[in-house]
Structures are given as structure tokens and as C-alpha cells.
Amino acid sequence: AAIVAIISRFNDRINALVSEDKVQKKFTTKQISTKSATPFVALIRKEIQTITGYPAVFINMLFGCLLMVILAFISMFFSTSSIVAYFVPASEVPRYLPLARTIFGMVTTWFGTSMFCAANSAAISYSLEGRSNWLMATMPVSSKQIFGAKIAVNMLYVLIFSVVTQIFFLIPGHITIETALRNVILPLCIVFLVSNVGLAIDIRRPNFDWTSVIDITKR
């Protein structure tokens, strides 16, 4: 709660520091070079460059992912048994330990899923291309590949952050292997859904006339 409060307190300042100038970046064909193994891989690289190229987008889209990694890392310094000992006598700790792990696993599953779902870069990826969106229409790739790459990148970084988070939870024994697998699979399934819905809305009602990347990020 303290970490969330601190980050929220300085969120506006962080956005101001990482905001780009009010001039949209121009995409070039170099970003989708045909030197990649396949056109789809090239599109994925282009999407990654787009997200990392706008610090404000990177921070806002990955806020939930970064928060989960930070919380999981901090949890490594506390054992489940020591936490249970705060609520029950020491002699009763072994008895309540399985229940504590079950509760902890449920909390990490649902809270983690909500945080990872907030990392929905696909929902603004079409509008983010701005006035250079015509460039994609000139490339020898299908619309399915273009939009598929946007969703693939969204799921890729969620997968990476989710796996790292579960490793941090597993090291001190807060969760079981089964819970860790659930904590990876469930967010990916829901992220796939919200990414498709978000991208569909963005394609249906794009905003190519934005002047500040913060405007499009806050959609």
C-alpha cells in the first residue's frame, strides 16, 4: 500500500519528466526491416521499439507489471511462517501454514491478474502510430499480421514480468508450483481477451491527431 501511495503521489511528475515533445515521431521502414526472420517478427520488433521509444507509454503501460515485480521482490525478505506467527501462537504456525499459502496464492492470482491486465498497450497501439499510420498500409504484410503483432507484444511482456514475479514468490515458498502456473496462465488468458477488445475499439475509433503522447496513453 505504501509503494502504491508513493508512486501515485508522484505519478504526474513522472509523466511530466518522461513526456515527449508535442511532435509525433515519424516511423520509418527501417523499423520493419525485412532482414528479420519473418515479417511477423519484424512487426513485433517494430512494436517493441514503439513502446520503448515513448518513455511515458512505457511507464504507464508497464506500471502494473513493474509494481508486481517490486512487491514480489520485497516479499522474498519475509517468510510465510513469520507472517503467520503475527496472528497465531508459534505452536499453531505449522497448522495454519497451508491455509496461509492458499490465501496468499489466491491474493497473488487475482491482484496480479488485475495488475497485468492494466498493461494493455494493444488498446492504444493503433492510434499511437499517429499520422504515420499510412506507412503500415504500404507494407507487404496483411492486417492480420499487423494487429496480431500488437497483441503478441502485449502478451510477451506480460508473460516475462509474470514469470519473474512468480519466481520471486516461489523462492521463499510463499506459493506452490501449481499456484505459480495458475498465476501465469490466467493473466495471459485474460490479457489476450482485453487486448483484443481494446485493439478492436482503438481500430474502430482511432485518434491519429494527438499532439502529446500522454493524451493517447491516458485513453
Predicted regions and their residues:
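Hydrophobic alpha-helical transmembrane segments of membrane proteins
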Residues: 1-134, 142-219
